[in-house]
C-alpha cells in the first residue's frame, strides 16, 4: 500500500479517528436519526393510513398529501397544520420533516418514488444501540491515490437496498490506487461538500466481518495534481446495515474490490 505519511503519530491518528467515530455514531443515534426510523411506507394514489404516523396519506401530481383527523396535527416549517396538507413535489433525494409530538415524519423521494418514514425516539433499535463495531484504526489503511476525472460526468445507475428501486448518480471520475501490490480503481460520485468525492464499495470482507451490501467512503477534494487520500479506516456503514427501512444505494459493479479491506466499520451488533 502507498500510505499518506509513514511518520503519522499513531496516538494522534487514533484520537482523531475515535472522535470521528463518536460523532458518526452520535448522529446515527440522535433522537430522530436513522436508528429511530420505525417504518418505510410508500404512499399511493389511493389514500392509506400507516400505524406509526397520523392522518391518511396519498400522493399524486401535486406531491404527497396528508389528511389529518380530528385532534391530529403536524408542525411543518414551524407552522401547525390541521386537516388537509399537501407537501408539494419533492425533488429526488430531497425531503421534508414534519413534527408530530416527540416524533418526526420524514416525507422524501428516493429512486423516483415518494416515501413516508416516521422517526420515533423510543424505537428499540435506537434505545438498545451500543455503538458500531470497527477495526482498530491503522495509518497503513490511509492510502494515497489519483483521481482521474471523466471528460463529462457519467450518469450511473445503481441498485438499492430496496428490491426494484434504482438510484442514478453523476460519476465525475475514477480513483486509482494500489493495495497489496495490485492497482485498483473505484468509480466516484460527488460528495456532500463542493469538490469532495464519495465511493460505494464492497470487498473480500463483505459478508464476513463487514456489511455484505455496501460501505461508503468520503474523500476530500483532490489536490491540484489529482492526489487523493482514501482513508479506509473511515469506511462507514450506510443506514441499510442497521435497518430494512433504508433505501441505500448499492455500489456499481466495478467497485467490488477483490482484496480484503480490513479497516473501517464492521457488521452492526443491532439490526431491525
Q: Language model features by range: what are they?
A:
Residues 103-171, 178:
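Surface-exposed beta-loop interaction hotspot
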Residues 28, 220-272:
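Long, compositionally biased interface segments
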Residues 42-91, 223:
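Forkhead-associated
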Residues 2-47, 68-72:
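Hydrophobic, proline/glycine-rich low-complexity stretches
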Residues 51-53, 77, 99-101, 178-182, ...:
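Short strand-coil-strand connectors
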Residues 176-223, 233:
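Acidic/His-leaning functional-site neighborhoods
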Amino acid at each position: 500500500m502507498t500510505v499518506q505519511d509513514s511518520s503519522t503519530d499513531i496516538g494522534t491518528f487514533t484520537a482523531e479517528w475515535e472522535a470521528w467515530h463518536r460523532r458518526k455514531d452520535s448522529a446515527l443515534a440522535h433522537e430522530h436519526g436513522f436508528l429511530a426510523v420505525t417504518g418505510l411506507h410508500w404512499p399511493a394514489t389511493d389514500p392509506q393510513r400507516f400505524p406509526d404516523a397520523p392522518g391518511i396519506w396519498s400522493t399524486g401530481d401535486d406531491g404527497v398529501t396528508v389528511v389529518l383527523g380530528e385532534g391530529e396535527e403536524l408542525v411543518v416549517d414551524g407552522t401547525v397544520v390541521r386537516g388537509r396538507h399537501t407537501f408539494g413535489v419533492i425533488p429526488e433525494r430531497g425531503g421534508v420533516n414534519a413534527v408530530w409530538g416527540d416524533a418526526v415524519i420524514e416525507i422524501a423521494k428516493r429512486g423516483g418514488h415518494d416515501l413516508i418514514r416516521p422517526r420515533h425516539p423510543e424505537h428499540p433499535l435506537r434505545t438498545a444501540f451500543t455503538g458500531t463495531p470497527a477495526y482498530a484504526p491503522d495509518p497503513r489503511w490511509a492510502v494515497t491515490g489519483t483521481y482521474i476525472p471523466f471528460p463529462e460526468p457519467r450518469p450511473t445507475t445503481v441498485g438499492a437496498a430496496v428490491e426494484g428501486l434504482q438510484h442514478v448518480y453523476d460519476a465525475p471520475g475514477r480513483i486509482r490506487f494500489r493495495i497489496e501490490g495490485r492497482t485498483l480503481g473505484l468509480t466516484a460520485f460527488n460528495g456532500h461538500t463542493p469538490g469532495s468525492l464519495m465511493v460505494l464499495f464492497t470487498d473480500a470482507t463483505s459478508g464476513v466481518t463487514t456489511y455484505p451490501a455496501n460501505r461508503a467512503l468520503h474523500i476530500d477534494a483532490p489536490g491540484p495534481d489529482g492526489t487523493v487520500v482514501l482513508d479506509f479506516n473511515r469506511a462507514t456503514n450506510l443506514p441499510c446495515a442497521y435497518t430494512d427501512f433504508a433505501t441505500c444505494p448499492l455500489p456499481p459493479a466495478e467497485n467490488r474490490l477483490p482484496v480484503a479491506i480490513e479497516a473501517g466499520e464492521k457488521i452492526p451488533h443491532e439490526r431491525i
